[in-house]
UniProtKB/Swiss-Prot annotation:
It holds the Pfam family YcgL. PROSITE patterns: YCGL. Coiled coil: none annotated. This is YcgL domain-containing protein VC0395_A1544/VC395_2072.
């Protein structure tokens, strides 16, 4: 299964996967507005490649059911909170 991947100029780390290049007909208008003008990144064969941030099966399922897949950036790490949790576990 081939898919085209686009990145958002508005939201860093946000990517849109669609089955056909430049065919955004299945993407809701509200998502298109929030995403901004898509910037083409690459064409990928999902049968022959793993993806770095997302599960290939989830991408394929979403594209079959909804006509697209939206990849959001991972949540930012809260280093202060992690430090506090480690400290709390260390105290007897």
């Amino acid at each position: 299964m081939l898919c085209s991947i686009y990145k958002s100029p508005k939201k860093e780390g946000t990517y849109l996967y669609i089955p056909k290049r430049d065919d955004f007909s299945q993407v809701p208008d509200t998502l298109k507005q929030m995403f901004g003008k898509p910037i083409f990144v690459m064409l990928v064969n999902l049968e022959q490649r793993q993806l770095a941030q997302v599960n290939v099966e989830k991408v394929k399922q979403s594209m079959q059911e909804q006509g697209f897949f939206l990849q959001l950036p991972p949540p930012p790490e809260n280093l202060l909170e992690q430090h506090k949790e480690r400290k709390a576990r260390q105290t007897p």
